[in-house]
Amino acid sequence: MNDLALALGLGIPLSLLVGVIIGYFISIKIFKKQIRDNPPITENQIKAMYAKMGRKLSETQVKEIMRSIKNQK
């Protein structure tokens, strides 16, 4: 009976700790993938930002800016 209580007393917290650590790394990986696939700034936002500064960007320049944002890691 004592062995079972000791095993449960050590096994449950250890399992919870391992689960929390694994969950943390999985959530970080998913978050980074979502940010990479859906950057927090859009092409329209870039165009609007440059329009406020008095510049009109071509599509090539907008794509280049988006590519440079995605390549920053």
From Swiss-Prot:
GO CC annotations, alphabetized: membrane
Keyword Coiled coil appears in the UniProt entry: no
Recorded topology in the membrane: Single-pass membrane protein
Compartments, record wording: Membrane
Cysteines engaged in disulfide bonds, as pairs: none
Record's keyword terms, sorted: Membrane, Transmembrane, Transmembrane helix
InterPro entries linked to this entry: UPF0154
Membrane-spanning ranges: 6-26
Major location (coarse): membrane
Protein family per UniProt: Belongs to the UPF0154 family.
Name of the protein in question: UPF0154 protein MG335.1 homolog
Species per Swiss-Prot/TrEMBL record: Mycoplasma pneumoniae (strain ATCC 29342 / M129 / Subtype 1) (Mycoplasmoides pneumoniae)
High-level lineage: Bacteria, Bacillati, Mycoplasmatota, Mycoplasmoidales, Mycoplasmoidaceae
